[in-house]
């Protein structure tokens, strides 16, 4: 039966199920494993798993009436294959697991021990960790002591730990998450996929933040060089997803406009940067990336955004069913969907060739939560290098890779709300790591000198006095934990940027930064931050997501007044751009900073 199925012409679910049963022989050997795996993986696209289990039970009962012992045993072999190949589906779906238990109980009641022994539902391990947005898995401690300072980390060390973080997050994504995203076109009620996209965007933003935290062009150029080599190591690890995140951060408008900084980057680094950028550019539907991925052997981490885009394109181009009655499924579409999802599923079957340091993982996790808005990053970029019509005198003729074509926006989601208890536990472990590695004299406190070292990893950490609550000249574990709990994005702040709100009067209507509605009246109906000037309703105070930034003027060399950043009119939390491919000898086009970008270039776009 399996050999007679013509998927291109379409078939019913029953025909496909019968074909999968017939794909087994009486001993359990599969003659067409690809068909069986494809149907068992893809069936939730068309019918619920509980309905498939009911159909299997019906097939078994019908074969018993027909005295077809061969069909009975083949049905049991298919159930066994289903449980062993997709165990998470049974652990996370109690209704489905109960149906299989009922089938096994029926076999036992009939005294058919041989068939019953083929179905083992009790030994399915737990997969509840896959549904937890925040989860610390045990990791192996490296033998040698590793520095937690960003400036001291080797590119391979940083690449390995970024790979581990993203791989751990990726392993929690299930088929149902992909199906939900493609069906809804967004990540509504999809916290696991939201979290992965959030982590991807955090890496890109962290790259920008680390570059912009340096006060001089030479220092910023060194950080750029460091991240280019991190991207090179990510390619060696065949981690294309994080590679794209790092390259996206390096190519973002807040970084690409830093002409003086780029003039200090060496020609060899620029050449390497261009090559890495060309690898992940969207040109030719990511043809360079696809060729490189196809040639990979062993562990590989594909760019999730590219493959999600492929899934969405298929969903829009081809129908799931070939008839109005929804009885004949589109086998050609199912085969194409399966090829994409199987590539993604293969990632979890191969562990990355890295060993992770728990202290560094904790530090990186918290560092990546230092969220900034588009406006804030661009304003900081303007402070580092104010606008100027004339180009700086360059020690070299090197230029950064040119800006890219606009990439389509295709996802916009809210940052998942993490479990507060889990975040508190994670912060405590991170603080313990900080004290273990930065408390040089071992007195159980962080001095001002030690605090300055820590700020290398947290560029926009609040002042020493803000953490030193009792003003005794040093920071205790409890004070640091208290600070991070207050400023954690989960608890309302943003890593030290908590608003100093007070009641305010306004003679004219002003807009609430949270709900965008006007604050009307001259009485104290609103709140205003004394530091950054943000306004909000009293009832919006606890939901205000924008971080506090002290107001700073950005004045061009010509003395013109500051102007809004290019992203001001398009409120999006993060999207990144990729440089446009071109000849290396050509100069990049001038970026007109005064123009407003109506759509920021990006693959992932997520409101954090």
Curated annotation (Swiss-Prot):
GO terms for biological process: cellular response to calcium ion; Ras protein signal transduction. It holds the Pfam family C1_1. The N-terminal Ras-GEF domain mediates association with F-actin. Belongs to the RASGRP family. Ca(2+) 2 binds at residues 468, 470, 472, 474, 479. Residues 382-405, 555-596 are annotated as: Disordered. It is a peripheral membrane protein. It is found in: Cytoplasm, Cytosol; Cell membrane; Synapse, Synaptosome; Cell projection, Ruffle membrane. Functions as a calcium- and DAG-regulated nucleotide exchange factor specifically activating Rap through the exchange of bound GDP for GTP. May also activate other GTPases such as RRAS, RRAS2, NRAS, KRAS but not HRAS. Functions in aggregation of platelets and adhesion of T-lymphocytes and neutrophils probably through inside-out integrin activation. May function in the muscarinic acetylcholine receptor M1/CHRM1 signaling pathway. The gene is Rasgrp2. The keyword Mitochondrion does not apply. One of its GO terms (cellular component) is synapse. InterPro entries: C1-like_sf, EF-hand-dom_pair, EF_Hand_1_Ca_BS, EF_hand_dom, PE/DAG-bd, Ras-like_GEF, Ras-like_Gua-exchang_fac_N, Ras_GEF_dom_sf. Expressed in striatal neurons (at protein level). Expressed in the hematopoietic system. Detected in olfactory structures and deep cortical layers of brain. Keywords: Calcium, Cell membrane, Cell projection, Cytoplasm, Guanine-nucleotide releasing factor, Membrane, Metal-binding, Phosphoprotein, Repeat, Synapse, Synaptosome, Zinc, Zinc-finger. PROSITE patterns: EF_HAND_1, EF_HAND_2, RASGEF_CAT, RASGEF_NTER, ZF_DAG_PE_1, ZF_DAG_PE_2. This is RAS guanyl-releasing protein 2. One of its GO terms (molecular function) is guanyl-nucleotide exchange factor activity. It comes from the Eukaryota. Residues 154-387 form the Ras-GEF domain. It comes from Rattus norvegicus. Forms a signaling complex with RAP1 and BRAF. Interacts with F-actin. Interacts with RAP1. Coiled coil: none annotated. Residues 4-126 form the N-terminal Ras-GEF domain. The modification Phosphoserine is found at residues 116-117, 147, 554, 575. Ca(2+) 1 binds at residues 439, 441, 443, 445, 450. A zinc finger (Phorbol-ester/DAG-type) spans 498-548. Its main location: cytoplasm.
């Amino acid at each position: 039966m399996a050999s007679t199925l013509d998927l291109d012409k379409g078939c019913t679910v029953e025909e496909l199920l019968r074909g999968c049963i017939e794909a087994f022989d009486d001993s359990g050997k599969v003659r067409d494993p690809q068909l069986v795996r494809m149907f068992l993986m893809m069936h939730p696209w068309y019918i619920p798993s509980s309905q498939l289990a009911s159909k299997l039970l019906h097939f078994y009962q019908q074969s018993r009436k027909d005295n077809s012992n061969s069909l009975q045993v083949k049905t049991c072999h298919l159930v066994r294959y289903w449980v062993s190949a997709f165990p998470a589906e049974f652990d996370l779906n109690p209704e489905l697991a109960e149906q299989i238990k009922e089938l096994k109980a029926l076999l036992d009641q009939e005294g058919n021990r041989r068939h019953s022994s083929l179905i083992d539902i009790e030994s399915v391990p737990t997969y509840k960790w896959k549904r937890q947005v925040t989860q610390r898995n045990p990791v192996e401690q490296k033998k040698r002591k590793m520095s937690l300072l960003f400036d001291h980390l080797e590119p391979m060390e940083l690449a390995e730990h970024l790979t581990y973080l993203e791989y751990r997050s990726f392993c929690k994504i299930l088929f149902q998450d992909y199906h939900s995203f493609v069906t809804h076109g967004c990540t509504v009620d999809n916290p696991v996929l939201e979290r992965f996209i959030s982590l991807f965007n955090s890496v890109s933003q962290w790259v920008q933040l680390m570059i912009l935290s340096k006060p001089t062009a030479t220092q910023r150029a060194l950080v750029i060089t460091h991240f280019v080599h991190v991207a090179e190591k990510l390619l060696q690890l065949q981690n294309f997803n994080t590679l794209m995140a790092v390259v996206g951060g390096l190519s973002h408008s807040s970084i690409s406009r830093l002409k003086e900084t780029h003039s200090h980057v060496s020609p060899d680094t620029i050449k390497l940067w261009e090559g890495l950028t060309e690898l992940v550019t969207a040109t030719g539907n990511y043809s360079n990336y696809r060729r490189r991925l196809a040639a990979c052997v062993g562990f590989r981490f594909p760019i999730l955004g590219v493959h999600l885009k492929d899934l969405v394109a298929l969903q829009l181009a081809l129908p799931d069913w070939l008839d109005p009655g929804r009885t004949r499924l589109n086998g050609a579409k199912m085969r194409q969907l399966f090829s994409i999802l199987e590539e993604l599923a293969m990632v979890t079957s191969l562990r990355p060739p890295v060993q992770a340091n728990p202290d560094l993982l904790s530090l990186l996790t918290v560092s990546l939560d230092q969220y900034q808005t588009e406006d804030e990053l661009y304003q900081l970029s303007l402070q580092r290098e104010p606008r100027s019509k004339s180009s700086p005198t360059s020690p070299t003729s090197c230029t950064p890779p040119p800006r890219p074509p606009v990439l389509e926006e295709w996802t916009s989601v809210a940052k998942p709300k993490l479990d507060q208890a889990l975040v508190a536990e994670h912060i405590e472990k991170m603080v313990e790591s900080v004290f273990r590695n930065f408390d040089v004299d071992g007195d159980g406190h962080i001095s001002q000198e030690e605090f300055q070292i820590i700020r290398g990893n947290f560029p926009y950490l609040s002042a020493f006095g803000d953490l030193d609550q009792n003003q005794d000249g040093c920071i205790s574990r409890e004070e640091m934990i208290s600070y991070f709990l207050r400023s954690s994005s989960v608890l309302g702040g943003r890593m030290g940027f908590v608003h100093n709100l007070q009641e305010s009067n306004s003679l004219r209507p002003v807009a609430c930064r949270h709900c965008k509605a006007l604050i009307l009246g001259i009485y104290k109906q609103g709140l205003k931050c004394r530091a950054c000037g943000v306004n909000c309703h009293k009832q919006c105070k606890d939901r205000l997501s924008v971080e506090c930034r002290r107001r700073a003027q950005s004045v061009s060399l010509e003395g013109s007044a500051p102007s809004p950043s290019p992203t001001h009119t398009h409120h999006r939390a993060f999207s990144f751009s990729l440089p446009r491919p071109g000849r290396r000898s050509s100069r990049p086009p001038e970026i007109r900073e005064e123009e407003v970008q109506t759509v920021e270039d990006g693959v992932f776009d997520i409101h954090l």
